[in-house]
Amino acid sequence: MTVLLALDGVACIRGDRLVFEELSLALNRGDALWVRGPNGAGKSSLIRLAAGLLRPAAGRVVRRGRIALIDEAAALDSELPLRRALDFWARVDTVDGHAVDRAMDMMALNTLADVPVAMLSTGQRRRAAMVRVIASGAPIWLLDEPANGMDQAATARLVAAIATHRANGGAVLLASHFALAIPDLDELVMGVLA
């Protein structure tokens, strides 16, 4: 097995609060891990640590391959039409337009290509964020509440995209308050430390 993402004895401190400690995990090609727990348990902090946006207070994080991240913000220019906003990130991520086309089709956003990002619903913005993740070609997906605002059909598309990514050898670390119908999903339950 090829490990794409590993955390070894990781601790996270935010402000003066210990969020979690001695956390270890490994994601191999084809793996998916659902991180769940109450608000404040450290789900988003774990995603940010895995992405390299936070430094662990202890332990180490090893990434083998590029990452693609969804967090609370879609990071799309709200004034641009959706397709132009996605094309900007495609250039940053050095992805060709065909990958964006395929990802937009996968997330059923082609009909919204000319709509300004500011006019999209929350669920549509989450789907747009998934387009960027899918098109990136990154083997490691870090998804923080990716289904927020999505209806049942959009959630099914998200689940299908995750399944395709895993079948192609990718790994997914998914933080979510609610379960998604993803087969063979490992689970990490995080709690609040006293």
Curated annotation (Swiss-Prot):
Pfam families: ABC_tran. ATP binds at G37, P38, N39, G40, A41, G42, K43, S44. It is a peripheral membrane protein. InterPro entries: AAA+_ATPase, ABC_transporter-like_ATP-bd, ABC_transptr_haem_export_CcmA, P-loop_NTPase. It is an enzyme of class 7 (translocase). It catalyses: heme b(in) + ATP + H2O = heme b(out) + ADP + phosphate + H(+). Its main location: membrane. One of its GO terms (molecular function) is ATP binding. GO terms for cellular component: plasma membrane. Gene3D superfamilies: P-loop containing nucleotide triphosphate hydrolases (3.40.50.300). Part of the ABC transporter complex CcmAB involved in the biogenesis of c-type cytochromes; once thought to export heme, this seems not to be the case, but its exact role is uncertain. Responsible for energy coupling to the transport system. This is Cytochrome c biogenesis ATP-binding export protein CcmA. It comes from Sphingopyxis alaskensis (strain DSM 13593 / LMG 18877 / RB2256). The gene is ccmA.
